[in-house]
Every structure is written in structure tokens, then in C-alpha cells.
Amino acid sequence: MIDIGANLAHESFDLDREAVFSRAWGAGVQAIILTGSCRQSNRAVQQLRLTAPDRLYCTAGVHPHHASDWTDEDAELITSLAAHAGLVSLGECGLDYHRDLSPREVQRKVFIAQLELAIRLEKPVFLHQRSAHDDFHAIVREYRAALPDACVH
């Protein structure tokens, strides 16, 4: 069993992160994929992964909530992190119109930028969609044939 979407780099886990890992291993989880969702967490999951490199893997991307923060630095960081063996996917990226924490047009542009980056880096994508089905589907349909693989939640 693999947990594919663990946001364990978040500060809310600082006091009990090791206990969370211990319970997961005890329950039969064989590997955990730590989710990167912004510049800070992308760096954090890479460092956290090194504490158990045989069981912890990570993603790097910019969640739609953080799309307004996207800069060229994010693309450069994701490209750099993609060279590490433990980075198994780009994301979490996509569209989230439920809260609209970033403007929808910005979300779409950043989503497309990350899909194009995943294609160039030949990495699968970990996708997020909430209350944005039509736009999400249209964008994914345009890029799907070129993407190495994808997981949607």
C-alpha cells in the first residue's frame, strides 16, 4: 500500500510527524509520496524525503491556491528537484474554483505551465481539481497525449 498524497511537510505535523510515519509503517504502508504544493513545501518535502529515502518519495509543484505566487523561480526549482531520484511526479497542480484563492485565469496559466514542464521533464503529474471540471477537462484533454502519466484527485 502506498499513500500517494501526504501533506506531511506542513508545520501542523512538526510535533508528531515521526508518530504519523510510525503508525503508517505499522499499518502496512510501504511508501509515502510527500506532496509539494508551493515553493517552501517543495523544498521541505525533498529534505523530509531524505530521512527515509527507501520509503519516502515526493512531488514538486504549485497548488492552484498558490498559483498567484508562481514565478520563473518555481519552474527553475521544480526543474532542479526533478533531477533527484526521489521526485516521482510534478504537482500538486490543477484548478480549484471552490475557494478561488488565486484568480481563475492565473490558475489556468500556472496549470498549463506545469503541464508543459512535466512534458519537458518527462515526469507524471499529480493533479488537483475542485469545482473546475469543464476548464480542467479541456486543459487536460489538450495535453494528455504528451504527458507521461497522471493521477487525479
What is each of the regions a protein language model found here?
Residues M1-V152:
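Mid-domain alpha/beta scaffold segments of enzyme catalytic cores
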